[in-house]
Amino acid sequence: MNQDEHKIVVRRMAGLIAAASVLIAVYVLRLIFLQLVNSDSFKAQATNTTDYNFTVTAARGDIVDSAGRRIAASTTSYNVVLSKLLMGDEDLDAMLQRIVELLEAHGEKWNDSLLIGEPDAAGHYSFTAQADSTSDQKALAAMKDSLGLQQYATADDVMEKLVEDYKLESYPLHWQRVLGGIHYEMQQQAFSNVNNFVMAENVSEVTVATIKENSLTMPGVEIVETSTRSYDEGDIIPHVLGRVGKITAEKWKVTDENGQTTYPLREKGYNMNDMIGVSGLEAVYEDELRGRDGVETITRSSDGVIVGTAMTTVPEPGHTVQLTIDSAFQQAVDKALAKNIEMINSTYNSSSSAKAAAGAVVVISTKDGSVLAASNYPSYDQNLFATQYSQYSSDPGLPLLNRALQGLYTPGSTFKPAVAVAALDSGVINRFSTVYCNGVYTYYDGYRPKCTRHGHSGNIDVITAIKWSCNIFFYDVGRRTTSDVYDAYAYKMGLGTRTGVEVNEATGRLTTKNDSNYTASLDIQAAIGQGNTVVTPVQLATYAGTLANRGVRYRTHFVKAILDTNTGKVLQETQPEVMDVIEDRGDTFDLVRQGMIGVSETVSGLKNYPVTIACKTGTPQRSETYYVGSTRKHYTNTMMIAYGPAEDAEIALGIVIEYGGGGARAGNLVADIFDAYYAMKDGSLTLDETGAGETADTTADGEDAVPETVENNDALTDDTAPAEQPAA
């Protein structure tokens, strides 16, 4: 190669190198621009995915009895859920039609809270809200408000609005109503890309299988596993357990008197379609039972493809609430109460127009105030509440009424031990004090209340007065003690005041000098448990426990502990809490106990019982009357308080049987309860047993003349009441 050719090659190589250098420089600069200057923007364009977070509901904690048996639990169920995110561009109304047809074919229902029925023959609609239902009327008003309609809007106006808003004009009237109702429900549940719509709940396994089989042609229609509240024994303390239910519109959106709107449940982490405790222990312990929801994250690309799912927060189940009640003992007390009511009707009320048809029993531990049983008769089954609510609510026996905690009853002679404690402790009387009983109380001119004097007459001391329920003794001692004093003692023992139970209870009241109808005669009537005084069965049991504990009253309670659901570890345990104390300055409670032991010696079912029981009967009047010949008489309730063993009590109880008659008629019931208690202690009582066993004197003949006559002292009959009573 000559020199000229060599120069040409060198020049060409230099040019190529220069060109390559320029290209490399441009490429490097472009990389710098892409990666450093605008990297975030181009990365987003390259990936272009969106994350959507969905709530995974945590399992609700169980409620168990003192032995660990489940009473309320969360069981697996299946919901039909629509995901707007996964539905994509599908025709929503066509999809809804298909789902409805599938659900109808399997006998399922779907969520539809629109208070409008099907159109009539003329194509007009009517509201289904009940005129006398406050909740229905509130829901109707909220519906109109949410649709932007005036409150005078008709059902036709509402449907016209829904048809217009959701473009349903092309559908037949029936489908306009169906689809309009579903769209309204979607609106209520805030259906969106981040909030799924629960269309149907607790569907059958057949429905689940059918929807899964059609999943490829029904995008966004999913079966979601969830939990439903169920009750292993639906008739165990349903009134106390309470219920769970959907969050209502009123609770979700709260508007105060100034028009300020807040969403308190949303602020606590709830979704609008969540379940929540609405009454009883389910509501009181909502924060413990609820658990912590999880979060599932779904990632979708720009072209709508789901590219990833992850459980970003694992749900945590709620805590377990353990009760003080043993299910087997509770069942035994329930059956014993029903058996006693049946006995009263067959033996005493068979020809009466008023039957004993309702009652309540509360049994507590005297050691700490824990409730061992709280029975209502009649009652209901939690598992049937939703399907049989109409039947329950219209039942004249009022099975939905929590008589044990909210029933208010005149205590009758069960109140007399409280007056005795007040008189003894305040020094009005002592163990040697007597009142002369000749059958008529003559202190007031023109007012002569009577005493039947069965088993006693002459000078009566406090022990004898309690045993034979002497009205004259308590008229006089009550008058001298005054209602101000004996009421104060009664309050301390748990009467006319809250006992401390975790769920709603009635307060009751005692007769006071501030009552509008107060007279001196009312004061002495209050001393025998009549007048304006009304108490609850749980108060009677608490009061009996205070008598047994020589004046120490514990807070009455249903919850034993809060447990970790996964480990069973005790997180919180209820400790005995003293609510009040009467300082026993001598033999006050010993004397009252002796009198109450004397009562049990006269009562069928208790007089031969192997354990000494202290009790007091009561036969308070009801307002309804009947005639025996020309004599007008009042129907009466059966009342009883008891504790035992008398010298070192373990349990105390309060009993009410409406229209039961004499208080001593509950004697066999008390014996049955103690039988069940001792069977529970020795482990021989099981949940499947029929309850109480045989006790002494269980036949009708065992209810002899003695207790029947004693009962007559517990009520003031009309023939002893004056036309006018003396003023205070």
Predicted regions and their residues:
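Beta-lactamase-like hydrolase cores
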Residues: 331-364, 379
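Membrane-proximal periplasmic segments of bacterial cell-envelope enzymes
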Residues: 1-314, 350, 354-360, 705, ...
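Acidic/histidine-enriched alpha-helical segments
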Residues: 110-124, 349-367, 504-507, 557-567, ...
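Beta-lactam-recognizing serine transpeptidase/beta-lactamase-like catalytic domain environment
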Residues: 72, 78, 299-316, 325, ...
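Amphipathic, well-packed alpha-helical segments that form the structural scaffold of globular domains
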Residues: 286, 290-293, 303-304, 334-342, ...
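Short, gly/Ser/Thr-rich active-site loops of penicillin-recognizing serine hydrolases
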Residues: 569-572, 671-728
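Solvent-exposed, polar/charged alpha-helical surfaces in well-ordered, non-transmembrane soluble domains
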Residues: 93-101, 209, 213, 238-242, ...
